[in-house]
């Protein structure tokens, strides 16, 4: 068939900001698609709202629009660009929904735009529950017995027919709010009632529960000529009942008999053919472990999180092939880019085991409900490759960077019998470690199977790990056991721990006996054909397949799994570094373990090592490759934390020297530097005990900001206003890290300003200054950032520029630098300095046109800024105003307080850019998912300290036609100011009260500022959660509310009566 010649211009829709359930895998898919289409000579137009992506780089498409992914804006782009075709299946759920909306609004028909790849009716057949069930019945494919109900009686009738347990899924609620598993009548009444209450159409789907069945996924591809293949099949270690995005997954499946494998394979191919999908598709099965009965759980007619995992697990580039199928190619016309000799119609074969473990945000959200169910909670994931299940699994565990290196977690080990068993029966993020502990306590495989329904094959594998632990403990220094432990994925650190010696000694013992890993290639064909790709994993075997070349090389450390505080921004910088290293004539080698990202695409670097980011794993690669040095500036805190350990082992760290990094990160050394440079910072001191903390706070005066030293994303930071709050914090936070003291600073109120700079040690170039809308005290990652600054006078800008240059020179920075200042009264004080790439690099690079990561890398490799065309100073400001708006995933995490503070909570970001601040903000807020009604009611519940400030906001809302609602205290003050206000009952008063108003949809905006004291039971917390769960915009910072008001004022007309004639 070949490619279609009748289309010239194609619009690709991205997936927008990173939220729980839709992470970096779509940047990887979108980037691949754009490259594939450009390769074929098509004109590519890309629209996406997320600036932290590689796909929104101007080199990726012919034209890039960073605009909100809404009907209004995408239609406008279609009108301007008039594309021939649109490719929505690479933009996740967002892209699919957009395509459906464009079609329903008649836009596609009006402008004659063809949907490429999977057709609309196929999308709807897979996505709509009723249509999907009908199709499965037609194909004779079993789906779980289910029914749609509107009353509790109907639920009883259903249970009488199928029996317990059942699953309740409310209609039109986000992420299964109100639903759950029902085991008995008591559950039934509670869950169905709550489900019907939460569903806006009072409707639930009840289905026979198949929790406990094996969950198996097939990743399939089909082309327009009806060729279909299975790229990869995967097995969830956690049985059905836990969302696949929250499950530990292995590929290929480990426990299926050949008959089961073929049965499910045939079924998945039959389904993709019946749906007429052209491209990639993911089919999820539930399989009864005791018979050949299976059910279809769901089908995703698009590239998904699983396809990113399948691509990295097999080396088969699903998104790239899907894009080519969309423009008419067939599988047997496309070469497999890994082997470059076989065709894409050849099913991949694996001679290794891949494990994926999710990374959850519970370290940031202590109060969140940690249990895992049908609603996804993980922010990211890690993947590891090994030659056996144990090796693969243990490598994945130590890739998580959650302070665990083995099936061993101190908190879990201290649990009593009852709590431990509860963790096994009701899964949460620590179940894997609970299994390890249970085996240590002597639980049998059968007992564990009864508690968890995890297949006995996996349980035996965990038991093998624990058994080896015991043998190591009893035989200190045994070389045979050491060899076996390394083959099974044990790290030196754990072996040293069991032997009571140091990691270094275990390492030396191995080196003396020639025990070090070899690197095997991922080649899609189990080494059947020769392969051209440089994609490797380490394992303890005989033959090494990774050859060192003659070219000088540089090793780049990636940033690991996506989590709050360390998002896709760092992967963006990593990819740019790799490209710059290649441009500078070196070989670029990357080490990373996140299957979702562009950096782990085998075509990004010259060599890719898919390995954990630990000292041991990185050192093995350094020993083999002998690079000129290692770059750690772009991998976030992950890479920075490895720097000193690597340097201690003689590795050259490229860029800012270690002792200079330490001068920026270590409190006392940093203060000394600031004093020498005569740059002011807020008063502060370091406390090592509770008593000392009390004295410091008393001396510098409340409010104070307290935090542990060395953190990313402000973990465990808090602003405290009085002594009892301080003592309460110290009791919880000093435990964060006893070796590291706690920092206590005077909390200065004022505007926060952020500066990114590039320095070669002498020359300093400043691409841009950003002004934060939220005052200091809200984490910079959770603030709306504006570029260029709108309210900063020229004289203050000069001061910022001078201080940034002095700091960069004073700290001898080589590479990137990020500084946060607070503008208090008439001066700017330094809050913190990060001697590395920061999360604003992608945003600033895009809005200023300065390729920051690229320039910084070349500087680190020895060029000076003037040689690259940059003199010391400030980059000319752009005329357009751009805003970076944070995006949160609160709807997916129940019990989490949404108040903004010094601890970061956002998972992603979007950008809005226009001629004025108001227009840019409108785009940014809309793109972040906020709905902005132009009339209705605003509910104020304000803390005493903010009441004066809230008056002017209420007045302005009233002037543009909003009704004002408020609780008694606030209402009284507004009334005195002559603002008409309706008083609403507090939660403790009789109904209807505050929460009823929010539930009934009678408030369009809720503005609620925090009353001190953090226990979630407080009214404020309930108000904020109720807003999130009912999709009402809730603002916890008056600054954000003011920004929203400016937008509303600019899009609504004022209605002022005429002045009275004199």
From Swiss-Prot:
Catalytic activity: hydrogencarbonate + L-glutamine + 2 ATP + H2O = carbamoyl phosphate + L-glutamate + 2 ADP + phosphate + 2 H(+)
Source organism (scientific name): Halalkalibacterium halodurans (strain ATCC BAA-125 / DSM 18197 / FERM 7344 / JCM 9153 / C-125) (Bacillus halodurans)
Domain (MGS-like) ranges: 930-1062
Residues annotated for Mn(2+) 2 binding in this entry: 298, 300
Keyword Ligase: yes
Family statement: Belongs to the CarB family.
Residues noted as binding Mg(2+) 2 in the record, renumbered to the chain: 298, 300
E.C. code: 6.3.4.16, 6.3.5.5
Region listing for Oligomerization domain, in residue ranges: 402-546
Protein name: Carbamoyl phosphate synthase pyrimidine-specific large chain
Ranges for region Allosteric domain: 930-1062
Keywords: Amino-acid biosynthesis, Arginine biosynthesis, ATP-binding, Ligase, Magnesium, Manganese, Metal-binding, Nucleotide-binding, Pyrimidine biosynthesis, Repeat
Sequence positions that bind Mn(2+) 1: 284, 298
CDD domains: MGS_CPS_II (cd01424)
Residues the entry annotates as binding ATP 1: 129, 169, 175-176, 208, 210, 215, 241-243, 284, 298
Residues that hold Mn(2+) 4 according to the record: 832, 834
Gene: pyrAB
Region: Carboxyphosphate synthetic domain, residue numbers: 1-401
Cofactor requirement: Mg(2+); Mn(2+)
A GO MF term: carbamoyl-phosphate synthase (ammonia) activity
Residues the record lists as binding Mg(2+) 3: 820, 832
Binding site for ATP 2: 707, 746, 748, 752, 777-780, 820, 832
GO CC, one annotated term: cytoplasm
Subunit structure: Composed of two chains; the small (or glutamine) chain promotes the hydrolysis of glutamine to ammonia, which is used by the large (or ammonia) chain to synthesize carbamoyl phosphate. Tetramer of heterodimers (alpha,beta)4.
Pfam families given in the database record: CPSase_L_D2 (PF02786), CPSase_L_D3 (PF02787), MGS (PF02142)
GO annotation terms (biological process): 'de novo' UMP biosynthetic process; glutamine metabolic process; L-arginine biosynthetic process
Residue ranges of the region described as Carbamoyl phosphate synthetic domain: 547-929
């Amino acid at each position: 068939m070949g490619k279609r010649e009748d289309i010239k211009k194609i619009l690709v829709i991205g997936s927008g900001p990173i939220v729980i359930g839709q992470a970096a895998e779509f940047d990887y898919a979108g980037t691949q698609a754009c490259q594939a289409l450009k390769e074929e000579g098509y004109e590519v137009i890309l629209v996406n709202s997320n600036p932290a992506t590689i796909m929104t780089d101007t080199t990726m498409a012919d034209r890039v629009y960073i605009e909100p992914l809404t009907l209004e804006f995408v239609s406008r782009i279609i009108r301007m660009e008039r594309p021939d075709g649109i490719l929505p299946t690479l933009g996740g759920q967002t892209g699919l929904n957009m395509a459906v909306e464009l079609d329903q609004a008649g836009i596609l028909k009006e402008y004659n735009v063809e949907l490429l790849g999977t057709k609309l009716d196929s999308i709807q057949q897979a996505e709509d529950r009723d249509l999907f069930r009908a199709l499965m019945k037609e194909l004779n494919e079993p789906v779980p017995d289910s029914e749609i109900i509107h009353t509790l009686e109907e639920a009883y009738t259903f249970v009488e027919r199928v029996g317990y347990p059942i699953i309740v899924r409310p209609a039109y609620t986000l992420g299964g709010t109100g639903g759950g598993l029902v085991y008995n009548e008591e559950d039934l009444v509670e869950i169905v009632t709550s489900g019907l209450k939460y569903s806006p159409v009072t409707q639930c789907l009840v289905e026979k529960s198949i929790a406990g069945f094996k969950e198996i996924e097939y990743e399939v591809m089909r082309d327009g000529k009806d060729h279909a293949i299975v790229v990869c099949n995967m097995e969830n270690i956690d049985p059905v009942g836990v969302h696949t995005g929250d499950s530990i997954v292995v590929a290929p499946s480990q426990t299926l008999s050949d008959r089961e494998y073929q049965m499910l394979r045939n079924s998945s191919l039959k389904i993709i053919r019946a749906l007429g999908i052209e491209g990639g598709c993911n089919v999820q099965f539930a399989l009864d472990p005791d018979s050949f009965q299976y059910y279809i759980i769901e089908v995703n007619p698009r590239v998904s999180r699983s396809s990113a995992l399948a691509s990295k697990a097999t080396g088969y580039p699903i998104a790239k092939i899907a894009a080519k199928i969309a423009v008419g190619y067939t599988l047997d016309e496309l070469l497999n880019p890994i082997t470059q000799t076989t065709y894409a119609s050849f099913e991949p074969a694996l001679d290794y085991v891949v494990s994926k473990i999710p990374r959850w945000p519970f370290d940031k959200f202590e109060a969140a409900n940690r249990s895992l169910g049908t609603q996804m909670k993980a922010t990211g994931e890690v993947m590891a490759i090994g030659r056996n299940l144990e090796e693969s699994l243990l490598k994945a565990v130590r890739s998580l960077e959650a302070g665990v290196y083995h099936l061993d977690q101190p908190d879990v080990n201290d649990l009593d019998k009852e709590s431990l068993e509860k963790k096994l029966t009701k899964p949460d993020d620590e179940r894997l470690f609970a299994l390890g502990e249970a085996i240590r306590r002597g639980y049998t495989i059968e007992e564990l199977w009864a508690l968890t329904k995890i297949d006995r094959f996996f349980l035996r594998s965990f038991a093998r790990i624990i058994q080896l632990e015991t043998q190591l403990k009893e035989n200190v220094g045994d070389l045979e056991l050491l060899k076996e432990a390394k083959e099974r994925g044990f790290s030196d650190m754990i072996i040293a721990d069991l032997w009571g010696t140091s990691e270094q000694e275990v390492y030396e013992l191995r080196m003396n006996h020639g025990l070090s890993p070899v690197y095997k290639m991922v080649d899609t064909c189990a080494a059947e054909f020769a392969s051209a790709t440089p994609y490797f994993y380490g394992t303890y075997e005989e033959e090494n397949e990774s050859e060192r070349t003659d070219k000088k090389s540089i090793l780049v450390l990636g940033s690991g799994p996506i989590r709050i505080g360390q998002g896709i921004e760092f992967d963006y910088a990593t990819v740019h570094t790799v490209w710059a290293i290649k441009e500078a004539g070196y070989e670029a080698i990357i080490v990373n373990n996140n299957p979702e990202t562009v950096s782990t695409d085998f075509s990004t670097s010259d060599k890719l090592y898919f390995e954990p980011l630990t000292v041991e794993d990185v050192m093995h690669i350094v020993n083999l490759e002998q690079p000129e040095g290692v770059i750690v500036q772009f991998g976030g805190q992950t890479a920075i934390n490895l720097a000193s350990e690597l340097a201690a082992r003689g590795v050259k760290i490229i860029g800012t020297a270690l002792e200079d990094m330490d001068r920026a990160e270590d409190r006392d050394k940093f203060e000394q530097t600031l004093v020498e440079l005569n740059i002011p910072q807020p008063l502060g001191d370091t406390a090592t005990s509770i008593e000392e903390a009390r004295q410091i706070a008393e001396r510098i005066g409340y409010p104070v900001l307290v935090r542990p030293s060395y953190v990313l994303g402000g973990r465990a930071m808090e602003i405290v206003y009085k002594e009892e709050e301080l003592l309460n914090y110290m009791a919880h936070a000093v435990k964060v890290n006893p070796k590291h003291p706690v920092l206590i600073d005077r909390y200065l109120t004022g505007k926060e300003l952020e500066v990114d700079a590039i320095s070669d040690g002498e020359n300093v170039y400043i691409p841009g200054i950003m002004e934060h809308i939220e005052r200091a005290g809200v984490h910079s990652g959770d603030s709306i950032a504006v570029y260029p600054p709108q309210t900063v006078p020229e004289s203050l800008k000069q001061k910022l520029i001078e201080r940034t240059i002095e700091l960069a020179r004073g700290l001898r920075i080589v590479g990137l630098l990020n500084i946060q200042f607070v503008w208090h009264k008439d001066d700017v004080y330094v809050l913190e300095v990060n001697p590395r790439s920061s999360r604003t690099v992608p945003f600033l690079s895009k809005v200023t046109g300065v390729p920051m990561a690229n320039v910084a890398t070349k500087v680190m490799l020895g060029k000076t800024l003037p040689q690259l065309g940059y003199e010391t100073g400030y980059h000319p400001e752009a005329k357009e105003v751009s805003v970076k708006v944070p995006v949160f995933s609160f709807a997916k995490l129940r019990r989490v307080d949404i108040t903004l503070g010094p601890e970061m909570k956002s998972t992603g970001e979007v950008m809005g850019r226009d001629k004025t601040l108001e227009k840019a903000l409108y785009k940014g807020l809309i793109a972040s998912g906020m709905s902005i009604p132009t009339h209705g009611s605003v509910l104020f519940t304000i803390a005493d300290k903010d009441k004066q400030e809230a008056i002017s906001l209420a007045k302005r809302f009233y002037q543009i036609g909003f009704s004002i609602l408020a609780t008694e205290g606030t209402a009284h003050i507004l009334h005195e100011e002559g603002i008409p206000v309706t008083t609403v009952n507090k939660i403790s008063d009789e109904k209807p009260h505050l929460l009823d108003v929010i539930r009934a949809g009678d408030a369009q905006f809720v503005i609620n500022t925090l009353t001190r004291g953090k226990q979630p039971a407080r009214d404020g917390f309930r108000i904020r959660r109720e807003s999130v769960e009912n999709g009402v915009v809730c603002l916890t910072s008056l600054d954000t509310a003011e920004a929203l008001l400016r937008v509303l004022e600019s899009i609504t007309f004022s209605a002022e009566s005429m002045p009275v004639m004199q």
